[in-house]
Amino acid sequence: MASNSTADGKDRFFSALIYVIPLIDAFMFGGFLLQQFPVLQIIYLPIMPLLQFYYQFPFASFIIFIVLFMAVVRNNNISHFIRFNAMQAILIGILLSLFGLIVAYVIQPVFGQGLVTETLYNFAFLGALACGFFGIVQSVLGRYAEIPTISDAAYSQVRF
């Protein structure tokens, strides 16, 4: 779609900041990997206060979703660059939530807390980290982060 943009510094900053949400959502899947490789915990040191706030309130993720969707994605006064990145971060969060539900109610009852569950959690954690950091880097560079399928869904939801 659109690979380059004319995003100014403010748009780049806020677009990159929005991708902290998928990083926070991915934290719940990182338990196994963070125990095996404690050096990865460095990733979460800068956002630890946000992480504690986010998980302290049960409906924080839902409230943030509603606010981002209604106040940012659907607001035509905000640049398309920010709205697209907000929608993409929301979609990554939704995918992580759905994945968590599937693992909790389908995979774990069948396979237990074994290797399959641990592998799926590691996959979700690393995938979300990759998407989050890719989105941050692309936003800082002023480019649209083209993540297959997710970007297509984000483009279809964000009006020009």
Swiss-Prot record:
Keywords: Cell membrane, Membrane, Transmembrane, Transmembrane helix. It is a multi-pass membrane protein. The keyword Cell membrane applies. One of its GO terms (cellular component) is plasma membrane. The chain crosses the membrane at residues 13-33, 53-73, 87-107, 122-142. It holds the Pfam family TIC20. It is found in: Cell membrane. It comes from the Bacteria. Belongs to the Tic20 family. This is Tic20 family protein. It comes from Synechocystis sp. (strain ATCC 27184 / PCC 6803 / Kazusa).
